[in-house]
Structures are given as structure tokens and as C-alpha cells.
């Protein structure tokens, strides 16, 4: 199967899988308490996937590419001049490692700061409304969806970049990693929007935009890459960088928007009696379970 066919099939599978997993909370009628529990579970999934799946996968993608390149270079060097170039190789290897450490931190921070700026810009536009609290809540919903869409788009770029390497194993690993967190993210997004009181039709639109983001961007990335840019892309470890950037956006959405909203602390600072009690024991268990599920799945995926 050629690269274009495989990327098309992977994109279609991503779209369907993401949309179906997001529809589940809409298809089942939950009571108020069960909806809160599902939302808490979704928040746990968002946090767990950011920390246990996306960041490790991004770091792994970075180091895998550099280690493969080093292994290839060493093979070439042994064939040509083993003794003369040994010192140069070790220096280049150390330089690569220092670059990688910088990539990890910079990518994560840029993703987080990007979402922080998007959040602030969205909030400043909303503050002119008559009811600032309602405006803040609306901004929270938009920012949550936008953050996950940006995250999904970065995932799409990662998959497109992986497809351009013409290595089927790399494509499948990136696809599995993306689906591992896209399905829970779609579930988490929809349950959060339901908890926030959005109409079902609008939730479906939000979900569709989120589901489309990664497949569309993966196709565009793959089609937009020429041979020369493919080579340049492999040099700067684009797959790993894109995944780490998306992890930064994901962490912001999970920790700054979804968790406070679920915990009753939200952006609202009104002295609300219901909000002050926080999470019940069952909800805390659901939150911890949500955090642990991606961890267990990622351990299974690594083996």
C-alpha cells in the first residue's frame, strides 16, 4: 500500500473513531449526578493522557529519530574511516542530545503559553458583555474546544510528518498514540460541554470540528511536503516536536479549564454553596480512575 492510501485510511479511521467516542455521552441520557461523574472521569482522562501518553510519546519520537540517525551514521563511518572520525561522532552526539532537551522544554512551554494567550484574548473580547460571569463561562467553553482542536491539529501534523517518512511502523505507532488520547479527549470534551450546559446541536458541531482537525491537518501536511522539506523535517524531529507542542496545549486545557470547572471552582468567584463542597469521594475515585486508564493503556501499548 502506498503512503497516500495509508494516510487516507488512517485519517478516516481517526475521524470515525473520534466522533463515535464523543457521541457516547450524548447518546446515553445521564442524570445530573451521573453526568457530573462522567465529566469528572473525562477530566481524569484528559490529564492522564497528557501526562502518561502524549509527553512520553513525543519524547520517544524525538529520541528515536536521533538514535536511528546516530546508528546509521556509525554504520557509514565504520565502512569508510573508523579511526579518524570517532571523536567527531561523539561530539555531534552530545550536541544532538543538548538540542533534544531544549526541544522538549520549548515545545511544551510554547504549547502551554499559546493556549494561555488564546484564553486571554478570548476573555478580553468577552468581558464587554453585560454579564461578565456568563461571558467567562462562554469563553471557557470556546477555549476548551479551541485548545483541543489546536491539539488535534498538531496531532494531525505529527501523523502527516510520520507518513512522509515512508516508514509504516512509525505511522502506526503515531496513529495508535494519537487514537489512544483522541478517543478519551472527545469523550472528555463532550461531557465537559454537556456539564457546562451547551445545547446538543452545538456540542455536535464542536465535536465534529474536533474530530475533523487531525485528519484534515494530517492530509494537508502529507500533501504539502516536498522531498526537500521532508528531509528538513526529519532533521528537526518534527513528529516529536508537534506532539510535545500539542501536549502543552492539552495540559493547559485539562488543568486550567476542565479540572477547576469540574471541581466547582471554575472561573466563577461567586460564593456559591454548591461549588464550595468540591468533589465527593466517588468523584475523586472517578478522577483518579480517569487519570490511571491512559497510563494502563500506554503501558500495554509499549509492550
Swiss-Prot record:
Glycosylation sites: 29, 237
GO biological process: bicellular tight junction assembly; intracellular zinc ion homeostasis; regulation of cellular response to testosterone stimulus; regulation of vascular endothelial cell proliferation; zinc ion transmembrane transport
Alphabetically ordered keywords of this record: Cell membrane, Cytoplasm, Glycoprotein, Golgi apparatus, Ion transport, Membrane, Mitochondrion, Nucleus, Transmembrane, Transmembrane helix, Transport, Zinc, Zinc transport
Family assignment from sequence similarity: Belongs to the ZIP transporter (TC 2.A.5) family.
Pfam family, one: Zip
Example of a GO cellular component annotation carried by this entry: plasma membrane
Domain of life of the source: Eukaryota
Protein name: Zinc transporter ZIP9-A
Membrane topology: Multi-pass membrane protein
Function: Transports zinc ions across cell and organelle membranes into the cytoplasm and regulates intracellular zinc homeostasis. Participates in the zinc ions efflux out of the secretory compartments. Regulates intracellular zinc level, resulting in the enhancement of AKT1 and MAPK3/MAPK1 (Erk1/2) phosphorylation in response to the BCR activation. Also functions as a membrane androgen receptor that mediates, through a G protein, the non-classical androgen signaling pathway, characterized by the activation of MAPK3/MAPK1 (Erk1/2) and transcription factors CREB1 or ATF1.
Subcellular location: Golgi apparatus, trans-Golgi network membrane; Cell membrane; Cytoplasm, Perinuclear region; Mitochondrion
Disulfide topology: none
GO-annotated molecular function: androgen binding; G protein-coupled receptor activity; zinc efflux transmembrane transporter activity; zinc ion transmembrane transporter activity
Entry annotated with the keyword Ion transport: yes
Catalytic activity: Zn(2+)(in) = Zn(2+)(out)
Keyword Magnesium applies: no
Annotated transmembrane regions: 7-27, 35-55, 102-122, 142-162, 172-192, 206-226, 240-260, 282-302
Amino acid at each position: 500500500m502506498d503512503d497516500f492510501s495509508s494516510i487516507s485510511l488512517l485519517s478516516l479511521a481517526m475521524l470515525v473513531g473520534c466522533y463515535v467516542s464523543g457521541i457516547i455521552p450524548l447518546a446515553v441520557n445521564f442524570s445530573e449526578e451521573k453526568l457530573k461523574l462522567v465529566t469528572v472521569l473525562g477530566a481524569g482522562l484528559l490529564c492522564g493522557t497528557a501526562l502518561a501518553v502524549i509527553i512520553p510519546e513525543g519524547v520517544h519520537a524525538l529520541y528515536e529519530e536521533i538514535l536511528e540517525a546516530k546508528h546509521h551514521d556509525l554504520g557509514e563511518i565504520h565502512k569508510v574511516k573508523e579511526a579518524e572520525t570517532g571523536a567527531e561522532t561523539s561530539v555531534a552526539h552530545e550536541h544532538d542530545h543538548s538540542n533534544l532537551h531544549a526541544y522538549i522544554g520549548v515545545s511544551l512551554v510554547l504549547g502551554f503559553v499559546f493556549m494561555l494567550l488564546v484564553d486571554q484574548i478570548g476573555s478580553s473580547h468577552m468581558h464587554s458583555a453585560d454579564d461578565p460571569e456568563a461571558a467567562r463561562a462562554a469563553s471557557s467553553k470556546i477555549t476548551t474546544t479551541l485548545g483541543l482542536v489546536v491539539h488535534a491539529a498538531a496531532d494531525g501534523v505529527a501523523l502527516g510528518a510520520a507518513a512522509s517518512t515512508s516508514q509504516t511502523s512509525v505511522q502506526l505507532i503515531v496513529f495508535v498514540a494519537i487514537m489512544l488520547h483522541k478517543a478519551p479527549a472527545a469523550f472528555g470534551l463532550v461531557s465537559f460541554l454537556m456539564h457546562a450546559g451547551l445545547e446538543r446541536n452545538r456540542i455536535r458541531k464542536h465535536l465534529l470540528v474536533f474530530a475533523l482537525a487531525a485528519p484534515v491537518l494530517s492530509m494537508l501536511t502529507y500533501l504539502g511536503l516536498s522531498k526537500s522539506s521532508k528531509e528538513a523535517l526529519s532533521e528537526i524531529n518534527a513528529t516529536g516536536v508537534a506532539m510535545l507542542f500539542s501536549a502543552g496545549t492539552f495540559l493547559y486545557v485539562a488543568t486550567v479549564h476542565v479540572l477547576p470547572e469540574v471541581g466547582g471552582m471554575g472561573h466563577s468567584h461567586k460564593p456559591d454553596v454548591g461549588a464550595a463542597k468540591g468533589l465527593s469521594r466517588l468523584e475523586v475515585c472517578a478522577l483518579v480512575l480517569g487519570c490511571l486508564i491512559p497510563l494502563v493503556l500506554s503501558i500495554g501499548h509499549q509492550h
